[in-house]
């Protein structure tokens, strides 16, 4: 009996020991699995830190490193236009230049990004014209929002509507004051935004370009042009909702130019992109000081928008032994109302309900109107310009309707009427012989 009990005790003890050993082995396996899981998690976290982030949406294509120190973005603007001229024959039944046409107004891929956190870049070619052009190509160092340095080819900080992105302008073509503004130039610019955007400034030195001109890649002048702009939005971010989008400023440029290579505009253009003023020939050249001054401002509140600017362009010119100081001026006022109630802004309209007819959504509609005037200095005639082919003043008014199907696609139609004043009756078959009447349409993709 005692032997049987002893045998049973030994068997129980052995079973307990085996169970303990199994528990220990199981515990060891659990620890190994837990450690493996920790290692897998650490590896996944490390991989996530090094994995680029790629996003595609209505703001284009973007790829960024996990720490966002390196960013590449692809955007684009495509504008397909039509111009239809009316009453484009004079009283002698002679054609007055204007051609009804479809055109690819802009076809611009926009490459931009950031390297090493503080260095931004932008490169913008345009395939919309008869030849490929480089419109923007610059590098920007961003020490802070209020202190940045830009170098390369970019817009000169003078014209308010000129500085507005092409995809956001109210009409197919910018107003008459743009004819007296510099366009793009090569140079250096110190700029920034102070107080969360309540004050912005820009001051730069450039090769120097004539009115409405882009720079070439080479400069034939020893002189430089200085340009600057200060723009305030004093109520931005405050509780005064009605004044948050009030902005006003002053811009200008000063330079000294002594050749026609960069000094004088080849011509001033109407809304329909027809020349209404030209200097007589290549013997008229820029010959000295050239300065511009432009007070400007805008106001947006709810669906209402208003933009206005005035510009003086003063240029010393010469034809042979004859010299003069010509001062041309221009101004414009443009207003808009979003009929569907969305907010208007300097950067366009975003529909509350993008176009989706199955859901009875139709996007946003905006009614726009503009009046503009450009006055040529009387001293330009008849020595520097021919009064038989060039007008001394152009007055233009326009109305239009913009349809924002969604944030990326927009269609618009507008009508423009430009009348001319001159020192004598225009010659037959010239643009200035009677008012220009033109209807524009556009289909735009911007992302």
Model-derived regions, located:
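Transmembrane beta-barrel strands of outer-membrane/channel proteins
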Residues: 76-84, 123-125, 151-153, 203-207, ...
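Residues on the lipid-exposed face of transmembrane beta-strands in outer-membrane beta-barrel proteins
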Residues: 61-63, 76-78, 104, 109-113, ...
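Surface-exposed loop and membrane-interface regions of Gram-negative outer-membrane beta-barrel proteins
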Residues: 40-54, 82-149, 158-166, 211-221, ...
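N-terminal periplasmic/intermembrane-space "pro-region" immediately following the signal or transit peptide
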Residues: 2-79, 86-90, 231, 339, ...
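Surface-exposed coil loops of outer-membrane beta-barrel proteins
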Residues: 90-95, 133, 144-231, 235-240, ...
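Residues that define the transmembrane beta-barrel architecture of outer-membrane proteins
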Residues: 57, 70, 96-107, 133-135, ...
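Outer-membrane beta-barrel pore domains
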Residues: 141, 242-244, 252, 259-447
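Short loop/turn motifs that connect adjacent beta-strands in outer-membrane beta-barrel proteins
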Residues: 63-72, 118, 146, 158, ...
């Amino acid at each position: 009996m005692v032997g049987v009990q002893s045998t049973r005790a030994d068997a129980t003890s052995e079973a307990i020991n085996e169970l303990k050993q199994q528990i220990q082995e199981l515990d060891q396996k659990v620890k190994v699995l837990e450690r493996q899981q920790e290692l897998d998690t650490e590896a996944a976290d490390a991989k996530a830190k090094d994995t680029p982030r790629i996003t595609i949406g209505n703001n284009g294509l973007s790829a960024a490193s996990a720490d966002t120190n390196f960013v590449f973005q692809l955007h684009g603007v495509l504008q397909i236009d039509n111009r239809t001229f009316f009453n484009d024959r004079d009283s002698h039944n002679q054609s007055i230049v204007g051609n009804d046409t479809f055109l690819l107004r802009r076809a611009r891929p926009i490459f931009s990004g950031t390297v090493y956190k503080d260095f931004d870049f932008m490169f913008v070619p345009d395939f919309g014209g008869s030849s490929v052009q480089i419109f923007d190509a610059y590098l920007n160092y961003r020490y802070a929002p209020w202190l940045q340095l830009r170098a390369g080819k970019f817009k000169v900080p003078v014209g308010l509507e000129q500085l507005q992105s092409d995809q956001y302008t109210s009409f197919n073509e910018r107003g008459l004051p743009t004819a007296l503004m510099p366009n793009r130039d090569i140079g250096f610019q110190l700029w920034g935004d102070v107080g969360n955007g309540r004050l912005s400034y820009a001051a730069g030195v450039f090769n120097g370009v004539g009115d409405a001109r882009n720079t070439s890649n080479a400069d034939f002048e020893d002189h430089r042009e200085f340009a600057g702009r200060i723009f305030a939005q004093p109520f931005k971010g405050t509780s005064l909702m009605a004044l948050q989008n009030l902005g006003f400023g002053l811009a200008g440029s000063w330079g000294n130019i002594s050749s026609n290579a960069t000094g004088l505009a080849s011509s001033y253009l109407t809304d329909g992109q027809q020349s209404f003023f030209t200097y007589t020939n290549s013997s008229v050249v820029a010959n000295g000081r050239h300065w511009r001054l432009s007070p400007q401002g805008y106001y947006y509140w709810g669906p209402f928008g208003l933009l206005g600017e005035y510009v003086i362009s003063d240029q010393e010119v010469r034809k042979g032994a004859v010299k003069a100081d010509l001062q041309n001026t221009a101004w414009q006022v443009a207003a808009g109302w979003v009929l569907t109630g969305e907010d208007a802004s300097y950067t366009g309209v975003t529909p509350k309900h993008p176009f989706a007819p199955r859901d009875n959504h139709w996007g946003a509609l905006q009614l726009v109107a503009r009046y503009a005037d450009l006055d040529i200095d009387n001293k330009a005639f008849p020595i520097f310009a021919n009064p038989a082919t060039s007008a001394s003043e152009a007055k233009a008014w326009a109305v239009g309707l913009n349809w924002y199907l969604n944030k990326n696609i927009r269609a618009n139609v507008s009508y423009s009427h430009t009348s001319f004043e001159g020192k004598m009756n225009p010659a037959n078959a010239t643009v200035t012989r009677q008012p220009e009447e033109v209807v524009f349409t556009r289909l735009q993709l911007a992302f």
